[in-house]
Amino acid sequence: MEIRRRPPNPKVRVAHLEYAVPHDEEEPKNILEKIVWAKDREVDAARERVPLQTLKRQIEDLPPTRDFLAALREAPVQPAVIAEVKKASPSKGVIREDFDPVAIAEAYAAGGARCLSVLTDKTFFQGGFDVLVEVRQAVDLPLLCKEFVLSPYQLFQARAAGADAVLLIAAILTDQDLQYLKKAAAALGLDVLVEVHDAAELERVLNLGGFPLIGINNRDLTSFETDLSTTEQLMERFGDRLQDQGSLLVSESGLFDRSDLDRVKAAGADAVLVGEALMRQQDVQSALTNLIHG
């Protein structure tokens, strides 16, 4: 899958005035590309509002991060559950009208989640780093910043907001990007969940090596359709290599009940990331407990 990047409009300075030069009109070819183009502009604007040095100063006084990977490895019930705090998505619109991230996070913690995932994209998922801050203040579980990371700046945003781990999506990053961002995340004490969707992406990640936490997204981010056989097919082909590298495998998206969890567990998944199935339930805590224990 090739996702084109479209950095913010270049700027030209004439005398003391600065102008943005518009790109030629062109449309993104799928939802993921649309998100990436918007994210490039968003990050550029964020840098101007909050300089990197400001984020660095905020991070200096923070306590150490929690061990996201260890929390999954040490789960008493397998597969371990990463429960997602998610208000909306591009494909489903608003998933939960009465969205209270603190109440949801507390219910997840009480219901047996090992870690939480928090959507920080505002434009397409109605999330935000402010939501991550709220959740961090409410619970002690390790937190994943679920973001479309394109720049090291976003890693500093995640750490400053209280994240313990970050998502890196192979489809939108080059091999060089993945390696550099992994090192930058480690320097900040952040675990990395690198996400793949197809054989080519998983092959890339395994060839790079050094990713102890790998996610297989059952959702095709170009169409947002889900298929649990994605995990099964990729694990059948690459399961031995994942085991040889000691990587923990997370199956993401399209998981709605215990039978789905058992299905991906049988394929080799060590953990699952579940969002919509829980967010649509009135009693989130009971729904999660039932999902974990059947």
Swiss-Prot record:
InterPro entries: Aldolase_TIM, Indole-3-glycerol_P_synth, Indole-3-glycerol_P_synth_dom, Indole-3-GlycerolPSynthase_CS, RibuloseP-bd_barrel. Its EC number is 4.1.1.48. SUPFAM superfamilies: Ribulose-phoshate binding barrel. It is an enzyme of class 4 (lyase). CDD domains: IGPS. Pfam families: IGPS (PF00218). Belongs to the TrpC family. The lineage of its organism: Bacteria, Bacillati, Cyanobacteriota, Cyanophyceae, Synechococcales. Gene3D superfamilies: Aldolase class I. Pathway: Amino-acid biosynthesis; L-tryptophan biosynthesis; L-tryptophan from chorismate: step 4/5. Keywords: Amino-acid biosynthesis, Aromatic amino acid biosynthesis, Decarboxylase, Lyase, Tryptophan biosynthesis. It catalyses: 1-(2-carboxyphenylamino)-1-deoxy-D-ribulose 5-phosphate + H(+) = (1S,2R)-1-C-(indol-3-yl)glycerol 3-phosphate + CO2 + H2O. The gene is trpC. GO terms for molecular function: indole-3-glycerol-phosphate synthase activity; phosphoribosylanthranilate isomerase activity. GO terms for biological process: L-tryptophan biosynthetic process. This is Indole-3-glycerol phosphate synthase. It comes from the Bacteria.
